[in-house]
Amino acid sequence: MARLPKPSAVVFVSNVARMTRFYRELASMAVVHEDGDHAVLEVEGFQLVIHALRGAPDPVSGGGGPVHVRRDSYLKVCLPVASIAAARTVAAQLGGAIQPPDKEWLSRERGFRACDGHDPEGNVVQVREAAG
């Protein structure tokens, strides 16, 4: 029986290099493949594809203006991290944000603490640490 490919999600972005760095550093992901149009990042059992938008307008992202956070997106990527607090710092350094500690929530039955945030282009992302 053939092995199934790893589950993955694709995030469409304006700046592939910047967004690859953001996700790579936020969730300690390894770069599996990278070219001018896309990058494939991997963390245990999951791949995230950072793919260039084609023909879409650039969102306001890091040029000093506000980032439009797409809260009602059809997809939210949830990534495992060692520490939500550390992820919050990394996200801020790279132009994104993770909400403050009072917005974190615990899922005892699923074994994690989570907090939402956004990447530098406004895509919603959630970080999850093991519940201790």
Annotated model-derived regions:
Residues 124-127:
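Short glycine-/small-residue motifs
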Residues 10-12:
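A conserved hydrophobic helix/loop-capping motif in glycosyltransferases and polysaccharide synthases
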